[in-house]
Amino acid sequence: MKVSIIGATGYGGLELIRLLHQHASVDIATLHSFSAQSETLATFYPHLKDLEASPLEKINSAEIIEKSDTVFIATPSGIAKDIALPYVDAGLNVIDLSGDFRLKDRQLYEKWYGKSAAPIEYIAKAEYGLAEFRDKKEARFIANPGCYATATLLGIAPLVISQLIDPTSIIVDAKSGISGAGKVPSASTHFTETNENMTLYKMNSHQHIPEIMQQLTKWDETIPAIQFSTSLIPITRGIFTTIYVKPKNPITQKELHTLYKSTYENAPFVRIQPENVYPTVKQVTASNYCDIGLAYNEKTNVITIVSVIDNLVKGAAGQAIQNLNIMANFAESDGLRFIPVYP
């Protein structure tokens, strides 16, 4: 399969290149960038020297359609809503890593992203690509989920789908490494601001909130809202999500683990930790795994779920490739089965 990557110089694009080089059924046909053309990626990223020689090109939709079967769009939000359309119309596989096609309500997108929304007919065509819970496995236009949304939804899905929790009780405390803010530097991601520091940001206003709610209410329409906070922590990669919920009825630790293990029995990238063991960010670094730990406090009747992912892999490029595997009828783990980087 021939693929093109638009937005190849960003962190998400770089991860796509790294991972696709390990995929036996995929060849990179073209690489595209808004900020640089004619040079190779190794000019900007020396770690790719002698590994990726394709030149960076301007975006030429006719050329991409001619040379590719699949297009990955790894641009900031607000760009894919325009540039994705010709590839969808041409019948190519299109996987958008931005937020432009995730929300089915155009007004919600414009409220939370502060940008004009994509045409409604294209939003309707896009399949939300939470890989473990895809509705239409044959879909060829995928809105890849956000990193916070992925960690949160995988962490809470078994309880919500089973309708075992008080729908008003969901509290999510999510923390991200600095790469989640993207490649373009800012005052808030400056080394001296982030090193030995932790910063709460976008309190009650993160754009992944409506995305999470859209999927949660699909599973349980009685959920009215969630309490959701996000923080930056001084690591390069990783999402560490702690979720608190109250079950409708008391539950044992064994019942909790049985529920999660049965839900994810056939999910190659979700690993449920043993009882009383909780995952760390380090154990999923540079991998497509989501590791989940569980606890129940019978005194407070609170379930705690710890869900960790690498924001650039399971939270972006890795899940995008997992979605490609599903749509192309490859093995779901093709190009993604490797040991996390440790230490």
From Swiss-Prot:
Q: List localization entries.
A: Cytoplasm
User: Which EC number applies?
Assistant: 1.2.1.38
Output the Gene Ontology cellular-component terms.
cytoplasm
From the UniProt record, give the pathway where this protein acts: Amino-acid biosynthesis; L-arginine biosynthesis; N(2)-acetyl-L-ornithine from L-glutamate: step 3/4
Query: Catalysed reaction(s)?
Result: N-acetyl-L-glutamate 5-semialdehyde + phosphate + NADP(+) = N-acetyl-L-glutamyl 5-phosphate + NADPH + H(+)
* Name of the protein in question: N-acetyl-gamma-glutamyl-phosphate reductase
CDD domains linked: AGPR_1_C, AGPR_1_N
Catalytic-site annotation from UniProt: C147
Any idea which GO molecular function terms this record carries? N-acetyl-gamma-glutamyl-phosphate reductase activity; NAD binding; NADP+ binding
Q: Which InterPro entries match?
A: AGPR_AS (IPR023013), AGPR_type-1 (IPR000706), NAD(P)-bd_dom_sf (IPR036291), NAGSA_dehydrogenase (IPR050085), Semialdehyde_DH_NAD-bd (IPR000534)
Q: Which family does it belong to?
A: Belongs to the NAGSA dehydrogenase family. Type 1 subfamily.
Question: What Pfam families does its record include?
Answer: Semialdhyde_dh, Semialdhyde_dhC_1
The UniProt entry lists the main location of this chain as: cytoplasm
Q: Could you list this entry's UniProt keywords, alphabetically sorted.
A: Amino-acid biosynthesis, Arginine biosynthesis, Cytoplasm, NADP, Oxidoreductase
Q: Which GO terms describe its biological process?
A: L-arginine biosynthetic process
Query: What is this protein's function per UniProt?
Result: Catalyzes the NADPH-dependent reduction of N-acetyl-5-glutamyl phosphate to yield N-acetyl-L-glutamate 5-semialdehyde.
Say which domain of life the source belongs to: Bacteria
